């Protein structure tokens, strides 16, 4: 954890705190399975556990609520695995889930995490993982430049429009809006 914190940008407290706390839930999430006689450790959903541990810890340390929310959001979303095969819609879904305003911090957190694993300072061009993050960054910027709707408010239609078109009020309206946002 400390190495990841060391790898985070010095001028971004939110990313440094997220780097410090992003794996704090691993001990609780640790699971051991045996394959071919070898023990393998897994940490499924450790990011969710880490987020739940981080929130009260940061509150107890009297950090501002906005910073706590941001750090916990980064911790909760740090386990993304971008693949070049992602469609534009998949990139938009990632942005909807994480927020355009957070993507650079998430990339910084991933680079810090890589540094924590390998103890080698990472920049976007330094490794295959870094180059994938750079490609994701380029694709995110392209989606943002297209003025893609990344929030429900940014859609050209709203719930009232859907109800006027004959969709009954209720959960269906929300499902349709979310579907439109994801496509």
Where are these regions (language model features)?
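Charged substrate- and nucleic-acid-binding regions of tRNA-handling and nucleotidyl-transfer enzymes
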Residues: 54-60, 117-183
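Divalent metal-dependent catalytic cores for phosphoryl transfer on phosphate-bearing substrates
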Residues: 2-128
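Short, motif-level signal for alpha-helix interfacial/capping segments enriched in acidic residues
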Residues: 1-2, 136
